[in-house]
Amino acid sequence: SEMCIRDSAHAFVGRAAYDWASELTIYLDHNAKKCGLGRKLYEALADRLKDMGVLNLYACIGYPKVEDEYLNKNSAQFHEHLGFRLCGTFENCGYKFNRWYDMIWMEKIIGEHTLDQAAVKPYSYSE
């Protein structure tokens, strides 16, 4: 059977002042959950971003007031387990499956903020 896995990291906001912040996203096939793969992907992304000089990591997460058959609180719990903390809630921000969901932002600081911050290094692919 095939398994679908996708991960990405991109600039948090498209302005130079936010170059040191990155939003992370991973999507795992249902069969790939609860086996440590998500943690490994996030840790690899965070390590690469830290090497580039990124300081702040963010995750935008759909969050139900009450869990239902479409959305649970697992993603928020996963991020908290990885050291992210809740830094913002947008009430009833997302609408899908004929219902409203909150959107939460979670943050993890992975580097030291200085007054003379070095520029973020561009991404370079290497195997």
Where are these regions (language model features)?
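A conserved beta-strand-loop-helix scaffold within acyl/acetyltransferase catalytic domains
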Residues: 8-18
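GNAT/GCN5-related N-acetyltransferase fold signature
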Residues: 9-11, 28, 106
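A short, internal acetyl-CoA/4′-phosphopantetheine-binding micro-motif in the GNAT/acyltransferase core
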Residues: 25-33, 61-65
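Conserved GNAT acetyl-CoA-binding A-motif
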Residues: 49-74
